């Protein structure tokens, strides 16, 4: 049985009618696949030998089936390649997001550590200032106590000198009284001449004693006045020296504070400039990365793979350079901060 007779037996009459309608130019068929109709359209229904028709039709059907199989395999391979590409892109995006998250966490930790360090340094400076203030107050109290002690000793010495002076005066008065008593006894015992002589002698002695007493008193008063004058001069000189010393110390502290303030301002400015440069470098890197991604999307599949590898390598190099730059910046800031710290 030839292929056409088998085809007529197997296929309904309506399908055969539609097949010949397709060959004559009309469209549409609901019974056979499009590939089969494409193959049948190429078959000639002229009156030729049944064997020749059979062989050509089988060959054409085999070629059509082979082409369909190859097209299906190509479609399947293209879909698999597309899925692999999408998976690779998702993985790449996930890794980039993970790296950005890690960088943000590192930055956050570094900022927290920096704040803790600054708080510790502020606390340390406050404690040092408190200790200096307490030491200054102790020194001031010690000096005040010393001055009070010296004043008490001076007062004690003055009182002792006064008592000694009063005792000397009492002694002199007692001696004078004794002499007067002796003179009176001598006056009574002796005659009028002797009485006159004793009176004159007593008068002379009294005048000499009074003169001596006045001279001693004047001398002591002069010495006391000179001593007081010298003490006041020494006290004024001491106070002037202390004032000068305090003024110089205050001037030095003020200069040191101004120098420290200038150094801190310079360091802050330097750190701000370094941070600005790092930020600009990061922005440039981000722009370069976006440009690289855009270029890789526009290129073909093979070219995209090569560009992707190049972009990956560039990104890795940029990340390494960024990390090295951040480490150098951290070291530089730490060294500058160490220089700004007050020496113990």
Curated annotation (Swiss-Prot):
State the disulfide connectivity.
Answer: none
What spans are recorded as compositionally biased (Basic and acidic residues)? Answer: 285-315
Query: Where are the annotated sequence repeats, by residue?
Result: 74-89, 90-105, 106-121, 122-137, 138-153, 154-169, 170-185, 186-201, 202-217, 218-233, 234-249, 250-265, 266-281, 282-297, 298-313, 314-329, 330-344
Give positions of region: Disordered.
206-244, 285-318
Q: Does the keyword Ubl conjugation apply?
A: no
Region 17 X 16 AA approximate tandem repeats of K-K-K-C-X-E-X-A-[KQ]-K-X-X-E-X-A-X: start-end pairs: 74-344
Q: Which compartments does it reside in? A: Cytoplasm
Tissue expression from the record: Testis. Located in spermatocytes and spermatid bundles.
The UniProt keyword set, sorted, is: Cytoplasm, Repeat
A single GO cellular-component term from the record reads: cytoplasm
Q: One biological process GO term for this chain?
A: sperm axoneme assembly
Q: What is known of its domains?
A: The predominant structure is alpha-helical.
Report the function annotation for this chain: Possible structural role in the sperm tail. It is associated with axonemal structures.
Q: What is this protein called?
A: Axoneme-associated protein mst101(1)
UniProt gene name: mst101(1)
